[in-house]
């Protein structure tokens, strides 16, 4: 492999797709051989020389390991940079992209561990993807909500409620001041609550809350199903009801299904909320798997208006910077290389719409100053237990979140330092809102 696929003198082309792999070779295996093997097994190579190699232009189609750098503080671990010619990949297909780059190479026996840390998608390939159904700006225009983060809540308990009681919980949260409520990712169409009943009860709650508050409201109706035809049926029913948004579990559902649903949502005026159920199976190990920044990039290409991205509150500073790095990759039009934030390559999105990050998991009103400072306005903050756990009920819990959010945004706009004064801002808001 090394003689053919390790090319340290290679000059990267503007149209190459670049990958950064964290690579741990087996003891005794040279890093150059492993890097070349990764390039070979994820492009044109196989375990032996075959006579049909002579029937193709191998230099045109092969992947190349063009750089290796040791990982600081780790023994026998390297970042291998691999360049792939754009002609290896089908236009507009995240499925084909990932099948080629990570489909087989992770089982290669010369490697102890392998992790895909980042991808550089060139403009020539980015332009073959539709991206999010609508994007952040169109979503704000449809909701008529500007200048603050959007607020949401996952309805709990996530399993076991009847459709009628589920709709009641949705109504109380929306009436209290939230912009969205959410189906849990586990909720599809079980015996205790079939999807059509849930869609009907939740849409009734949306319209009732809208009429009382004068605001556009939404509920993430989970359209995930066992086959794409059934997903289309559920999304079509949501469109008939006139609700603004549906939801998909994109990793368990698959990228092909996600892209299909995204295109349907674009054509039928639905926003698409994406949950990342199963992501930790792929991205939790530091030395093996795929980093979430790659899953976030590929989701933006496949299509999604929202994507769960973690909270960063309470984590180490380094983790915070890495999380904010892939949050920027989700929503910004152009992101510069910045290794301190885990961004290995400069990424130009060529005008593709942004995906709004969703912060959820263990957050409540006292986190609001930090969340406002970290995420800014273009984010959706999801308070599950932080809403439904309020001692006075769902609507007061929602009101508490809304008041805290607006107080923090106003304080920030007035130039106050939320990192120092955030607690005071929340306590001042308590005087005007007993919730």
From Swiss-Prot:
Residues at which substrate binds: 104, 154, 158, 276, 308, 360
Cofactor binding note from Swiss-Prot or TrEMBL: Binds 1 Mg(2+) ion per subunit.
Lineage top rank: taxon: Eukaryota
Protein name: Ribulose bisphosphate carboxylase large chain
Enzyme Commission identifier(s): 4.1.1.39
Active-site residues, as the UniProt record annotates them: 156 (proton acceptor), 275 (proton acceptor)
Other comment: The basic functional RuBisCO is composed of a large chain homodimer in a 'head-to-tail' conformation. In form I RuBisCO this homodimer is arranged in a barrel-like tetramer with the small subunits forming a tetrameric 'cap' on each end of the 'barrel'.
Stated family: Belongs to the RuBisCO large chain family. Type I subfamily.
Gene Ontology biological process: photorespiration; reductive pentose-phosphate cycle
One Gene Ontology term of the molecular function aspect: monooxygenase activity
Keywords attached to this entry: Calvin cycle, Carbon dioxide fixation, Chloroplast, Lyase, Magnesium, Metal-binding, Monooxygenase, Oxidoreductase, Photorespiration, Photosynthesis, Plastid
Compartments, as annotated in UniProt: Plastid, Chloroplast
Residues found modified as N6-carboxylysine: 182
Gene Ontology CC annotations of this record: chloroplast
Pfam families linked to this entry: RuBisCO_large (PF00016), RuBisCO_large_N (PF02788)
Main location (coarse class): plastid
Function description: RuBisCO catalyzes two reactions: the carboxylation of D-ribulose 1,5-bisphosphate, the primary event in carbon dioxide fixation, as well as the oxidative fragmentation of the pentose substrate in the photorespiration process. Both reactions occur simultaneously and in competition at the same active site.
Annotated site residue numbers, Transition state stabilizer: 315
Disulfides per UniProt: none
Binding residues for Mg(2+): 182, 184-185
Catalysed reactions listed for this entry: 2 (2R)-3-phosphoglycerate + 2 H(+) = D-ribulose 1,5-bisphosphate + CO2 + H2O; D-ribulose 1,5-bisphosphate + O2 = 2-phosphoglycolate + (2R)-3-phosphoglycerate + 2 H(+)
UniProt subunit comment: Heterohexadecamer of 8 large chains and 8 small chains.
Cofactor(s) essential for the protein: Mg(2+)
């Amino acid at each position: 492999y090394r003689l053919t696929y390790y090319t340290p003198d290679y000059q990267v082309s503007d149209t190459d797709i670049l990958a950064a792999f964290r690579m741990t070779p087996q003891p005794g295996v040279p890093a150059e051989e492993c890097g070349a093997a990764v390039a070979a097994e994820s492009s044109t190579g196989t375990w032996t020389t075959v006579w049909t190699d002579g029937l193709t232009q191998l230099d045109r189609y092969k992947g190349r390991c063009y750089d290796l750098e040791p990982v600081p503080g780790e023994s026998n671990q390297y970042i291998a940079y691999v360049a792939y010619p754009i002609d290896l990949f089908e236009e507009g297909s995240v499925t084909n992209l990932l099948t080629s780059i990570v489909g087989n190479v992770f089982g290669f026996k010369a490697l102890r561990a392998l992790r895909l840390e980042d991808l550089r998608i060139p403009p020539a390939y980015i332009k073959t993807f539709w991206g999010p159904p609508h994007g952040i700006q169109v979503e704000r225009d449809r909701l008529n909500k500007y200048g603050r983060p959007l607020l949401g809540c996952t309805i709990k308990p996530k399993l076991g409620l009847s459709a009628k009681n589920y709709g009641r919980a949705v109504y109380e949260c929306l009436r209290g001041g939230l912009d969205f409520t959410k189906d849990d990712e586990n909720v599809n169409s079980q015996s205790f609550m079939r999807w059509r009943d849930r869609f009907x009860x939740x849409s009734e709650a949306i319209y009732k809350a809208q009429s009382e508050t004068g605001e556009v409201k939404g509920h993430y109706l989970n359209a995930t199903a066992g086959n794409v035809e059934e997903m289309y049926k559920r999304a079509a029913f949501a469109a008939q009801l006139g609700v603004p948004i549906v939801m998909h579990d994109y990793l368990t559902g698959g990228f092909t299904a996600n892209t299909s649903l995204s295109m349907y949502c674009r054509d039928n005026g639905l926003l698409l909320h994406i949950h990342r159920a199963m992501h930790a199976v792929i991205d939790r190990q530091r030395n093996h798997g795929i980093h979430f920044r790659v899953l976030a990039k590929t989701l933006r290409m496949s299509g999604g208006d929202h994507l769960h991205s973690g909270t960063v509150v309470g984590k180490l500073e380094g983790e915070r910077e890495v999380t904010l790095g892939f949050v920027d990759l989700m929503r910004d039009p152009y992101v510069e290389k910045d290794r301190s934030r885990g961004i290995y390559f400069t990424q130009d999105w060529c005008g593709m719409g942004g995906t709004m990050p969703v912060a959820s998991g263990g957050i409540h009103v006292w986190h609001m100053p930090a969340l406002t400072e970290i995420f800014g306005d273009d984010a959706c903050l999801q308070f599950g237990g932080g809403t439904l756990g309020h001692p006075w009920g769902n609507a007061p819990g929602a009101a508490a979140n809304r008041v805290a959010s607006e107080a923090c945004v106003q304080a920030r706009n007035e130039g106050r330092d939320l990192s120092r004064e955030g607690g005071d801002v929340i306590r001042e808001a308590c005087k005007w809102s007993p919730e």
